[in-house]
Amino acid sequence: MSEEIFHYEIEDEIVLCLNYDGMYGINNINKIRQGANPNKEFTFGVDTYKIGDRILFNDCPRFNDFLFNNLKGTIKDISIDAENKCWWFTIEIDEDSVDLEYRPLDVATLDSEVEGKINVRFKVNEFADKEEDENEYGHIIPFNLAYAISIHKAQGLEFESVKIVITSNIEDRISKNIFYTAITRAKNNLKVYWNSDSQTRIFDSFQKRNSNKDIAIIRQKLKQ
């Protein structure tokens, strides 16, 4: 495998994997890529975040349809309010990805220095407090690191650059549909990291279960 997997080449880039564990799993790639971020660490429970980290929002009922599941963002600011025992996060997102009519009262919107972007600001309480929390999700961080994500999680998303990691121990889990989902996440740059034996076995398995036309489409996509 190439060390390129652990380094960004362009701003809007993602690494897609099937497995979470191991050297080339989602967890380790996220850890290494976050480690290359020179900004200060902020530890919230067992999680660590830095300004500049790439994130994806989770399906959090707290934000209704505003900050929705799989919304891409970048952490622009983190501040700790020790007196009120909470954290404040400012996240930069695509302006056209949200409808301001759905903005909850506990989310502020701020101008971004980047054209086509908008910043959203909200707090996360350090502890669950039924008396102070407006809902039961006020102490839950509503996003995860997203330098690397699963192929399943990437459905419906697009990135300028996509790097797909396929190790020999998970190649039997790669169906044609999973592989096609992965390679079609890339708008422009696409790289697949696998060894020649894995590539041969995967395409042989596709050949047995799918038409030659389907395989030709996939091969053509990889050449683009």
Protein language model regions, located:
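Core RecA-like ATPase module of SF1/SF2 helicases and allied nucleic-acid translocases
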Residues: 2-224
